[in-house]
């Protein structure tokens, strides 16, 4: 750590995560460790009063996420998922277009993201929470959440798996209580168009 810090000009380096969270000069911690360790490291930071930006996926399942949020609420410590697409200028542009009514009432979205990543060991290792969904499927799911919200009534999904058991590619349909639908695909086998489409009663919008 000291060698890396010296090479890249960092003022400090730490020998452990415990040493990091114990430093009173640290104001916020960005968690970018492998997926299965997010919950452990998030709790460590929260218990030491450190605000957290946690890389996606926030945790590997809903149970873990609820535990982290409950602890953050109890300790009154800020934490959020560091998914950068939520903070792009295009997010506001899309929101403004929808709010203007230019494309009418939103009835559905489709989104996909895929890369050829089948040779990356981390992506196919179940012990590291590998698979297309948790690595790249997060982004089209986030797109659906930003546009349609989270009031999902029904979920349908299917996937093709690697020999290791994690998903190689998947397709998800979300049905919302207001009648809208989202169709989402992600893949660790092939590249895709990598765009999202929003369908309204007066037109549609393409987000690339």
Where are these regions (language model features)?
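NAD(P)-binding Rossmann-fold cofactor-contacting core
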Residues: 1-8
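Conserved SAM-binding strand-loop segment of SAM-dependent methyltransferases
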Residues: 9-17
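Short, Asp-centered acidic motifs that coordinate Mg2+ and/or phosphate
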Residues: 12, 27-28, 108
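Structural detector of well-ordered beta-strand residues that form the stable sheet scaffold
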Residues: 14, 53, 78-80, 110, ...
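Beta-strand-loop-alpha-helix segment that lines the small-molecule cofactor/substrate pocket
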Residues: 21, 28-35, 39-86
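Predominantly a Rossmann-like dinucleotide-binding segment in NAD(P)-dependent oxidoreductases
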Residues: 85-156, 163
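Contiguous beta-strand/loop segments that form the cofactor/metal-binding neighborhood of enzyme cores
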Residues: 142-208
